Curated annotation (Swiss-Prot):
It comes from Buchnera aphidicola subsp. Schizaphis graminum (strain Sg). Part of the 50S ribosomal subunit; part of the 5S rRNA/L5/L18/L25 subcomplex. Contacts the 5S and 23S rRNAs. InterPro entries: Ribosomal_uL18_bac-type, Ribosomal_uL18_bac/euk. GO terms for cellular component: cytosolic large ribosomal subunit. GO terms for molecular function: 5S rRNA binding; structural constituent of ribosome. This is Large ribosomal subunit protein uL18. Gene3D superfamilies: 3.30.420.100. It comes from the Bacteria. GO terms for biological process: translation. SUPFAM superfamilies: Translational machinery components.
Amino acid sequence: MMFYRNKKIISRTRRLLKARCKIKSLGAIRLVVHRTSRHMYAQIISSESKVLAFASTLESKIKSDLKYTGNKEAAEIVGKIIAKRALLKGISNVSFDRSGFKYHGRIKKLADSARNFGLKF
């Protein structure tokens, strides 16, 4: 019996574990990003694994402003909101955890937007 393995998922999981292990060993506050085909999620998580700030395209404020929530425009807005919420809590330096996704497209747009609004990573 042959088992099907999706190479994309295996590669993403490998990248995820490798990067997360390095970030956790530093004990830094991290900006964790996750994407699906329809939504973007961003969380700021402390070294004790507590969520300090959260933003996603599921929020009614963001959802009402956008026609579609799974594109670069939505990622840019989520990046802006997560940066503002982090700065309100006094967080300016974070480690960027892209959850194994390639630094391209929506992930890059979210990171650039968060940097432009004051987060440093």
